[in-house]
Regions:
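Intrinsically disordered, low-complexity repeat and linker tracts
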Residues: 189-212
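Short helix/strand-capping turn motifs
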Residues: 1-11
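Tryptophan-paired
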Residues: 16-25, 30-32, 37-188, 208-211
């Protein structure tokens, strides 16, 4: 769903006597999505001595009491004159919400689905890379997993990725935190990129980006 709450529209500025004039003076409401989109991507270093040929993600868990049981459909009201420039529209009407008390459990990723690449670090987001360019590159070259749509929350999103270096091996885990920072966790692409370096060490990189 998409929405926006706009106030102080000067109706007189958008009135015309002709159809052509009306087109030039139309009212444009910049809508935003009411949810965010969470992606996971995984890659592993190639090479005979990389020791990543058997790694796999066994499960992913996002902590309990992170997401409200309900959230506002509309972001905060905003003046028409400034709404179009605000790409971080959000709702601050949290009050004291109740939160989902259970873990969000996501599937693991088998070894065959973890992209083998020469340099996993090359798939971190570049300093000048736009959000859309990065998403296009990751979807094309790495491939995403466990796409999830999330309610807006005023909390950081925390969780763990569990993995094994070999079939039947010890299950290890790595924590991640996607910060809220008071900004919109609505209308956002939330990306967690996990990559296995030489020896099987799992490193994580995460991004909060505009959802174009």
């Amino acid at each position: 769903p998409i929405s926006r709450a706009i106030t102080n529209i000067a109706i007189a500025d958008h009135v015309a006597d002709t159809e052509a004039g009306a087109k030039r003076k139309g009212i444009s409401i910049p809508l935003v999505r009411t949810v965010s989109k969470l992606h996971f991507y995984f890659a592993r270093k190639t090479g005979e001595d990389a020791m990543t040929e058997n790694v796999k993600v066994t499960r992913i868990e996002i902590d309990e009491n992170i997401f409200p049981t309900a959230s506002y459909v509309f972001p905060d009201e905003e003046d028409y004159a400034t709404a179009d420039a605000n790409k971080a529209a959000t709702s601050n009407k949290y009050g004291t919400p109740s939160y989902v008390p259970t873990l969000l459990k996501l599937d693991g990723v088998e070894n065959a689905q973890i992209k083998a690449v020469a340099d996993p670090l090359a798939y971190q987001r570049g300093s000048s890379e736009t959000a859309q360019a990065y998403m296009d590159r990751m979807n094309k070259d790495i491939g995403g997993h466990n796409l999830s749509y999330l309610r807006e929350t005023n909390k950081s999103i925390t969780g763990k990725i569990y993995y094994q270096l070999a079939e039947g091996g010890i299950e290890k885990s790595q924590e991640f935190t996607i910060p809220s920072s008071g900004n919109a966790i609505r209308n956002r692409e939330l990306v967690v990129y996990g990559y296995f370096l030489q020896g099987g060490a799992l490193c994580l990189d995460w991004q909060v980006m505009p959802w174009n």
